[in-house]
């Protein structure tokens, strides 16, 4: 009986967090253009490198002025110094990990990538997805990707308490919740030989205090934020 009540309490808490976070993030905001960073980088005579990115608005990048400013485009530009990079993005704004499994995984496999970048977790955190469900679906996704010859890199989940649109106590709740989801990224990656971007190693105080890293909607990052994300990704690559 006690266990059942505790389970209900945890579920209700997740729903409440999801509802409050969704309201904070989805209430009327400036509508920002989104982008598809797919394209080619570098000279055609160089050895080819096929890069696939699955994800959410961290890839479609509302808040930047052009595709060149998106973190994955910046990474591909650096890779193109020695490779002919073919980037294909399957990312859709608002996606949760279940959406990646159900809608983005199949076309990714058909692309036969050499490198796969998986940027997911923020929407699961915000919308009250349970940690157990997130882990199950992320493992389902990574298990399939790891069964290919591709190098798989997960985004992890940064400190979402830094988002300017969030205020205490929701800010603190999102910070703790996002840390748990980040740990899931690391656990799943370790099981399948994947890697995780260390966004949390990037100075958190700067993300809390520098509004220049955020776009006008105070939720998505700006071009300056994408530049920092690209630096984090490049250190892993």
Where are these regions (language model features)?
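Alpha/beta-hydrolase-fold catalytic nucleophile elbow
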Residues: 119, 155-156
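Conserved SGNH/GDSL esterase-like catalytic core that processes O-acyl groups on lipids
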Residues: 48-52, 58-136
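Residue-level recognition of beta-strand->loop/alpha-helix junctions
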Residues: 89-91, 156, 198-201
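A generic structural signal for well-ordered alpha-helical segments
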Residues: 80, 145, 188-190
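Generic structural signal for well-ordered alpha-helices
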Residues: 138-142, 182
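N-terminal secretory targeting modules
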Residues: 1-52, 81
């Amino acid at each position: 009986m006690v266990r059942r009540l505790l389970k209900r309490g945890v579920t209700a808490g997740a729903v409440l967090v999801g509802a409050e976070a969704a309201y904070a993030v989805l209430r009327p905001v400036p509508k920002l253009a989104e982008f598809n960073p797919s394209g080619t980088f570098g000279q055609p005579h160089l050895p080819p490198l096929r890069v696939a990115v699955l994800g959410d608005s961290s890839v479609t990048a509302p808040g930047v002025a052009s595709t060149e400013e998106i973190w994955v485009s910046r990474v591909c530009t650096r890779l193109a110094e020695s490779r002919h990079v073919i980037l294909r993005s399957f990312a859709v704004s608002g996606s949760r990990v279940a959406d990646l499994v159900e809608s983005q995984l199949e076309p990714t496999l058909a692309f036969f990538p050499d490198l796969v970048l998986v940027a997911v977790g923020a929407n699961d955190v915000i919308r009250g997805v349970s940690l157990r469900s997130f882990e199950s679906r992320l493992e389902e996704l990574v298990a399939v990707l790891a069964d290919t010859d591709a190098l798989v890199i997960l985004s992890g989940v940064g400190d979402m308490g830094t988002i300017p649109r969030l205020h205490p106590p929701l800010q603190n709740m999102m910070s703790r919740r996002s840390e748990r989801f980040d740990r899931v990224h690391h656990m799943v990656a370790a099981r399948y030989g994947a890697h995780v971007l260390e966004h949390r190693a990037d100075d958190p105080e700067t993300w809390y205090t520098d509004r220049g890293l955020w776009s006008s909607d105070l939720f998505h990052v700006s071009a300056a934020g994408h530049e920092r994300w690209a630096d984090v990704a490049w250190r892993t690559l």
